């Protein structure tokens, strides 16, 4: 009992650091952007109205939508948009057109994650460093250089892994939440009447009295829910109960106290609007607060970078991106990975955002469109999961998701007003990633169609080969094939040039599924083809670690014993040649050919021993 309690406490502390770091640092800029826009005059009723909108936005979007509803839609314990997409796709698998539409929508939502992933670290770290301007205006010219140095250090340490320092994320973020709660409480005690803003009638009254202004400021209010998607994305790491405990026990109370404390400060000192968060603190605490805020924003950014690695790996295994280089940074935790291309690609985009927009206020204009569209997509996918996956009545499904869809649409529509102020930037990044993903998926489909059309039947081919069998050599040959039942090009090349066949021959197909995990008991399918030849299908979920030698070791005792020292892996390295035809648009064919050329080798991706791999090339026109 004591052990389970300590485990729950540890998971809850971990969730505070990883899940809520992003939303916890939104206090740095959310209130400033709403009141600093100039759309809202400083009157008591307006301040009460805005604070009420903040509180009920957190309640409806985070507490009710994500913590209560969306967390229930887990995919074998896993969360995130990719897991939700797989769940929705499986729920409507008997409706091919609807399934195709949902897959496109879900992949677009996943692409937008990268757009959001550029803005969030930029605005978080920049807003933390901007606290130096409150200490002294002379520090203003150093804000951007310091921000860039902090970001560079953050991305430079990724290849070393974060296992060692990761244990401090929870405690540091807990100190952050305690600090912002105390800052807010100190000002609330001076103006306790500010707590009347908890009543929803203040939010409704403000909206009815100022419909136009309300619609405009929703684009800034959305800043208070930055990182809400992380609640669901990190479900597999922590579980539902720790995430819910961390939200209702720590994050939500601390955020509420701080936002209301900032409101109390603005009522007393309207001039504090230039940076209400830092101006809540006494002068002696400013420098320590800037340091703590920087640490908190770095932790929030770290969680997003780790999420980008994880999502990219999942998308690759679902077949929407080519294989990329993956390095494991921990021998104990296979989930801790480093992807150089993703890491430095994100860094370049974030630096570009900081240099282009130059302040957290300007970046706030860029934030919102991508994340609110992602929220709307999550709501849409949730509807299809509970309607077709869980089989709930249509009326109940509409009631459960309809109100959230209306809220998401309102926030999205408001953020569209910021399209030309900077909202185009994350949309552009998301659009580029989406084009890459869809081009790769369609290119692979066309490539497989071409390979199947040209392929010989494996059983017929082996039957003809063994009518006049070639010389057999000791050892095992493993031939990787895209689909079962077809002769791999590597086998044809081997017979043509070497004129030998190994004593044992395995024709292996790796099949990735739209489910997060597939256990060892369902890992292998094996079919004997005679003459010590086998057709092997290896099944993986999109979160499983692909390790071919380890999977093939499971064949022991099933008629096929593999000795690692005498096993060779034969791979086909295809060169794609774009042609004018009925495939994709010419620019997409050229893009696919380039992506295919630059893809990481299958040997590294499948953990094959480099000294046992033989690659044989061929050219394929699409």
Swiss-Prot record:
Predominant localisation class: membrane
Any single Gene Ontology cellular-component annotation: plasma membrane
InterPro entries tied to this protein: K+_transporter (IPR003855), K_trans_C (IPR053952), K_trans_N (IPR053951), Kup (IPR023051)
Domain of life: Bacteria
Record's subcellular location: Cell inner membrane
PANTHER family registered for this protein in UniProt: LOW AFFINITY POTASSIUM TRANSPORT SYSTEM PROTEIN KUP, OSMOTIC STRESS POTASSIUM TRANSPORTER
Name of the molecule in the record: Probable potassium transport system protein Kup
Gene source species: Verminephrobacter eiseniae (strain EF01-2)
Source species taxonomy: Bacteria, Pseudomonadati, Pseudomonadota, Betaproteobacteria, Burkholderiales
């Amino acid at each position: 009992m004591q052990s389970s309690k300590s485990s729950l406490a540890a998971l809850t502390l971990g969730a505070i650091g990883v899940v809520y770091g992003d939303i916890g640092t939104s206090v740095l800029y959310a209130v400033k952007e709403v009141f600093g826009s100039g759309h809202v005059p400083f009157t008591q009723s307006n301040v009460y109205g805005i604070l009420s909108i903040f509180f009920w936005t957190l309640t409806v979007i985070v507490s009710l939508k994500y913590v209560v509803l969306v967390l229930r839609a887990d995919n074998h314990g896993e969360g995130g948009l990719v897991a939700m997409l797989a769940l929705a796709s499986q729920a409507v698998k008997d409706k091919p057109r609807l399934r195709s539409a949902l897959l496109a929508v879900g992949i677009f939502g996943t692409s937008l994650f990268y757009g959001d992933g550029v803005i969030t670290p930029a605005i978080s770290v920049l807003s933390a460093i901007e606290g130096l301007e409150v200490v002294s205006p002379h520090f203003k010219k150093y804000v951007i250089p310091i921000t860039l140095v902090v970001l560079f250090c953050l991305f430079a340490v990724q290849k070393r892994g974060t296992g060692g320092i990761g244990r401090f994320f929870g405690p540091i973020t807990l100190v952050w939440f305690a600090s912002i709660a105390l800052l807010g409480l100190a000002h609330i005690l001076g103006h306790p009447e500010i707590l009347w803003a908890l009543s929803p009638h203040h939010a409704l009254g403000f909206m009815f009295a100022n419909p136009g202004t309300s619609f405009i400021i929703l684009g800034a209010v959305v800043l208070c829910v930055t990182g809400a998607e992380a609640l669901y994305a990190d479900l597999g790491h922590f579980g539902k109960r720790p995430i819910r405990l961390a939200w209702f026990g720590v994050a939500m109370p601390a955020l509420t106290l701080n936002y209301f404390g900032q409101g109390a400060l603005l009522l007393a000192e309207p001039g504090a609007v230039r940076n209400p968060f830092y101006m809540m603190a006494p002068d002696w605490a400013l420098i320590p607060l800037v340091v703590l805020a920087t640490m908190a924003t770095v932790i929030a950014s770290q969680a997003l970078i780790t999420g980008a690695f994880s999502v990219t790996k999942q998308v690759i295994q679902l077949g929407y991106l080519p294989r990329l280089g993956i390095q494991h940074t921990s021998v104990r935790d296979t989930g801790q990975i480093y992807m150089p291309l993703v890491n430095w690609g994100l860094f370049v985009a974030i630096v570009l955002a900081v240099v282009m927009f130059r302040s957290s206020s300007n970046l706030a204009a860029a934030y919102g469109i991508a994340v609110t569209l992602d929220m709307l997509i999550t709501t849409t996918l949730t509807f299809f999961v509970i309607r077709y996956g869980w089989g709930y009545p249509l009326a109940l499904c509409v009631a459960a998701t309809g109100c959230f869809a209306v809220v998401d649409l309102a926030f999205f529509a408001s953020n569209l007003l910021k399209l030309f102020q900077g909202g185009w930037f994350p949309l552009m990044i998301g659009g580029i990633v989406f084009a890459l993903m869809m081009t790769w998926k369609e290119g692979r489909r066309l490539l497989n169609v071409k390979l199947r059309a040209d392929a010989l039947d494996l059983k017929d081919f082996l039957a003809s080969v063994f009518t006049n069998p070639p010389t057999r050599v000791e050892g095992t040959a493993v031939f990787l094939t895209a689909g079962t039942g077809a002769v791999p090009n590597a086998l044809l090349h081997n017979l043509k040039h070497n004129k030998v066949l190994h004593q044992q021959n395995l024709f292996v197909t790796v099949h990735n599924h739209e489910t997060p995990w597939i256990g060892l008991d369902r890992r292998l399918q094996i079919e004997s083809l005679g003459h010590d030849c086998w057709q092997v299908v290896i099944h993986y979920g999109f979160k499983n670690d692909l390790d071919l030698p380890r999977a093939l070791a499971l064949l022991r005792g099933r008629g096929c014993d593999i000795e690692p020292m005498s096993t060779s892996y034969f791979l086909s390295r295809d060169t794609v040649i774009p042609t004018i035809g009925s495939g994709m648009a010419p620019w997409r064919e050229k893009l696919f050919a380039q992506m295919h050329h630059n893809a990481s080798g299958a040997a590294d991706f499948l953990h094959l021993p480099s000294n046992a791999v033989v690659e044989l090339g061929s050219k394929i026109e699409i």
